[in-house]
Amino acid sequence: MNVTFLGTSSGVPSLTRNVSSLALKLSQSSEVWLFDCGEGTQHQIMKSNIKSSQIKKIFITHMHGDHIYGLPGLLATLGLSGNSKGIEIYGPSELRSYINSALKSSFCKLSYPLHFVEVENYASKNKILFENNKIKVNCACLKHKIPAYGYRVSEKDKPGIFDIKKAQSLKIAPGPIYSELQQGKKVVLADGRTFDGKEFCGPPRVGESFVYCTDTVFSQSAVSLSKNANLLVHESTFSEEDENMAYEKLHSTTIMAAKTALLSNTKKLIITHLSPRYTNKNAITPSDLLKEAQKVFPNTQLAKDFLTTEIK
């Protein structure tokens, strides 16, 4: 899996950062899942390597405008292009009425169905939000001025590496049988020989996991959601010098984000949702924010618009 940052500013866009949105590209699939959709997100998609036709699911963290104002326009564009068979939208219960009202008021009729999933019950009861044979999604309540939710996408363990040389040495012809063996299945060849796929595969490979937490002040539920994740993307609206403001507005400082990564044993942290007050021309710069976080959690990276990173 990989993620592409489409917007990394908090509250309002700046000349270099759009408001919140992130695209997750699934492994071995053309599917893209979008996390938040601030104003201008579809313009950001057009400038990136993401194809809007690949978007199948959209996850919204909360109902503040910098996370949702881009949704009606994006959904309308997907309808006009005629390339969408349906979109699943996950988020707070208010999201359905917001989207339906915006589309109705602008006389927009989509050519594809929208499927809404309200996440409150899943988050409060720690229920799996989505699951198939390759992946599952969990969500958790965060701590913000309005209800907000973090999301975790976890790949299921993958089959071990297939030993092709061993199969070839036993004169097993390449083809669909290799796929069955790689899945650990027992197969019977045309000559009557029987093989157990487990004998040709190494140990299962642990699937990657990605966690997206914004908006929130430091939250124990974010720590629990991020446990042993490969990548945590966490908001860092404020510098540690502005900690009082973070508590007042229920946003995170760089130190809070880093502490979440440290306590959850996350492999890598990327900080995003930066306040526009921190620029290279001001007393505190984005580079300073990165250094603050790295003091607590060294494997921290600073998000910027159009950054793409592999989850590993």
From Swiss-Prot:
Disulphide linkage map: none
Active site: 66
Record's keyword annotation contains Hydrolase: yes
Keywords linked to the UniProt accession: Endonuclease, Hydrolase, Metal-binding, Nuclease, tRNA processing, Zinc
SUPFAM superfamilies named in the record: Metallo-hydrolase/oxidoreductase (SSF56281)
Binding site for Zn(2+) 2: 66-67, 215, 273
Enzyme class (EC, first level): hydrolase
Cofactor(s) recorded in Swiss-Prot or TrEMBL: Zn(2+)
This protein's record includes keyword Zinc: yes
Residues noted as binding Zn(2+) 1 in the record, renumbered to the chain: 62, 64, 144, 215
Catalytic activity: Endonucleolytic cleavage of RNA, removing extra 3' nucleotides from tRNA precursor, generating 3' termini of tRNAs. A 3'-hydroxy group is left at the tRNA terminus and a 5'-phosphoryl group is left at the trailer molecule
Cofactor note: Binds 2 Zn(2+) ions.
GO molecular function, one term: zinc ion binding
PANTHER family assigned to the protein according to its UniProt record, in alphabetical order: ZINC PHOSPHODIESTERASE ELAC PROTEIN 1
HAMAP family xref list: RNase_Z_BN
Subunit structure: Homodimer.
Name of this chain's protein: Ribonuclease Z
Organism listed in the record: Prochlorococcus marinus (strain MIT 9215)
